Amino acid sequence: SHSRLLLFFAGWSASPESFTGLKAENGTDIMLCYDYRDMTFHEDLSSYKEIHLIAWSMGVRMAELALAGKYALTTATAVNGTPRPIDDNFGIPENIFRGTLDNLTAEDMKRFNRRMCGSRDILAQYEKFPARPLEEVKDELQHIYNHCNGQSMTNADDTTSIQWTRAIISSDDHIFPAANQRNYWNGRCPVTEITAPHYPFYLWKQWNEL
């Protein structure tokens, strides 16, 4: 086992196969977290000297809830997400999230993936990965809604257990509005803007390129 860990929290509905193409540097282990129906984090990370967290989309808030401040993170990078993922100013507007939740069909899932990928080419690439069952991702979305909905969201800082060191924002994000991401991150940590859709991982071959 290595002394450096790259810990990745995926977004809603993602299958792990859509990230396995990304390689780690020598001496680095990779751990992928996905499927937020169960938020118990069983792994013991205490043997790692360095933990580099990368969280995408809904994974930003899910990482905060799952890790609950238990580990010192060397770096923490948010990609197209914020700690306030269901929020009219800082996340996905509540009515849009609720609309997705209330009637999620296979057709809606297709539309979601299309918007997430932004172009036919990227979508074709993404659709090669095995999709998770509709009932499962529906259930996951409900759990995410419940996880995010309980807290009083008066002050964003009160609910943040992770010191985020960097945010990456896709300017062409049609899922998690770039303007709302900017609203949240500006003044909180360094921000890198990229020209990409909500799913930007096709841009990179290695995790350290982020």
Regions found by a protein language model. Name each.
Residues I175, V191-L210:
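Catalytic histidine-centered segment of alpha/beta-hydrolase-like enzymes
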Residues S1-T40:
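Conserved HGGG/HGGXW glycine-rich cap/lid loop of the alpha/beta-hydrolase fold
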Residues Q125-T154:
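Hydrophobic, aromatic-rich cap/lid helix
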Residues S161, A167-I169, D173:
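Short beta-strand/loop motif that positions the catalytic acidic residue
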Residues P85-K128:
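Helix-rich cap/lid subdomain of alpha/beta-hydrolase
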Residues G21, Q163, F176-G187, K205:
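Short alpha-helix in the alpha/beta-hydrolase fold that links the catalytic acid
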Residues I54-A63:
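Gly/Ala-rich beta-loop-alpha elbow adjacent to hydrolase catalytic centers
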Residues G69-N103, Q142, W204:
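Flexible "cap/lid" loop of the alpha/beta hydrolase fold
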